[in-house]
């Protein structure tokens, strides 16, 4: 495979990786909807795994193949480049994920607080209703 076709293949994979990351983040954002959280989280996991594999297997490997095709003399040591690039991509993606998970956690906590308040209100109303009924029955017994 010549250098130009390697670069074209890398370009296609970068576009696919960006689209996959966008779909992954869209699924993560959609998971903020309490009712469809599990379904959207599984979509997010699938898309983020696909993104990681594209970056690691296609883009990084393609760049290494390209560099190797340009250096005919000796193989180039890519280990430090790969680790740095993987760390940067992982760090940036993880930062975005954590931000969304924090938002999701806040929404879940607010929803739980709301449900707890509604439950307490309902219990209070039922208690008041029972007290009124008891009071009315006492009044009827007095008469």
From Swiss-Prot:
Pfam families xref list: Med11
Keyword Cell inner membrane included in the entry's annotation: no
Subcellular location: Nucleus
Chief site of localization: nucleus
Region of interest (Disordered), ranges: 109-143
Keywords: Activator, Coiled coil, Developmental protein, Nucleus, Transcription, Transcription regulation
A GO BP annotation: transcription by RNA polymerase II
Biased composition (Basic and acidic residues): 111-136
Coiled coil (UniProt feature): 97-143
Keyword Ligase assigned: no
Molecular function as annotated in GO: TFIIH-class transcription factor complex binding; transcription coregulator activity
GO CC entries: core mediator complex; mediator complex
InterPro entries cross-referenced by the UniProt entry: Mediator_Med11 (IPR019404)
Assembly and binders: Component of the Mediator complex.
Family: Belongs to the Mediator complex subunit 11 family.
PANTHER family: MEDIATOR OF RNA POLYMERASE II TRANSCRIPTION SUBUNIT 11
Described function: Component of the Mediator complex, a coactivator involved in the regulated transcription of nearly all RNA polymerase II-dependent genes. Mediator functions as a bridge to convey information from gene-specific regulatory proteins to the basal RNA polymerase II transcription machinery. Mediator is recruited to promoters by direct interactions with regulatory proteins and serves as a scaffold for the assembly of a functional pre-initiation complex with RNA polymerase II and the general transcription factors.
Protein name, per record: Putative mediator of RNA polymerase II transcription subunit 11
Gene behind this protein: med11
